[in-house]
C-alpha cells in the first residue's frame, strides 16, 4: 500500500454541516425549495440562492399566519384539533388572506352570513 490514508483517522475534526435553513433562521427547507425552483423553471434555468431563502421565508410566514388564525378559530369553538372548517373560517375571516387564497377548501363548509335586508327590525312585527 503506497501512501494511502484510507481508513485512518487523520486527527482533524470534521466540520458539521449547517443547513441554509438554519443559517437563515427558518424552519422550511431552503435547499429543497431551491431544487424545486430550478427544476420548475423553463429549460432548467438559473435561480439565485437568495431567491430560495426569500421564497422559504414567505411560505413560512404565510403558514404561521394561517395556522395562528385557524388555532384561534378552533379555540373559540372549544376544540383542540384544527379541521378544514377552522382553516376556512380563518382564511375567509381575514380580508387579505381571503384576497390571496381563492381556492375552495374541501370540507370547509360555508361562511355564516345573513343579508341585512332579511333581518327584521326589533320593533317590527310580521303581518300575516
Curated annotation (Swiss-Prot):
Q: Name one GO molecular function term.
A: DNA binding
> Which Pfam families does the annotation name?
Histone, Histone_H2A_C
Looking at the keywords, is Ubl conjugation present?
Answer: yes
**Principal place where this protein is found?**
nucleus
The protein's matches in CDD domains, at most eight in alphabetical order, are given as: HFD_H2A
- For whether the record's keyword set contains DNA-binding, the answer is yes
Q: Where is this region: Disordered?
A: 1-20
Q: Give cross-link positions for Glycyl lysine isopeptide (Lys-Gly) (interchain with G-Cter in ubiquitin).
A: 122
Mod. after translation:
Monoubiquitination of Lys-122 gives a specific tag for epigenetic transcriptional repression.
Please list the residues that carry the modification N6-lactoyllysine: 12, 14, 116
Q: Where in the cell is it found?
A: Nucleus; Chromosome
Q: Sites of the modification N6-acetyllysine? A: 5, 8, 12
Organs and tissues of expression: Ubiquitously expressed.
Cellular component per GO, a single term = nucleosome
Q: List all Basic and acidic residues biased stretches.
A: 1-12
> What's in the keyword line of the UniProt record?
Acetylation, Chromosome, Developmental protein, DNA-binding, Isopeptide bond, Nucleosome core, Nucleus, Ubl conjugation
The family note in this entry says: Belongs to the histone H2A family.
What the protein does? Variant histone H2A which replaces conventional H2A in a subset of nucleosomes. Nucleosomes wrap and compact DNA into chromatin, limiting DNA accessibility to the cellular machineries which require DNA as a template. Histones thereby play a central role in transcription regulation, DNA repair, DNA replication and chromosomal stability. DNA accessibility is regulated via a complex set of post-translational modifications of histones, also called histone code, and nucleosome remodeling. May be required at gastrulation for correct mesoderm formation.
Name it: Histone H2A.Z-like
Organism listed in the record: Xenopus laevis (African clawed frog)
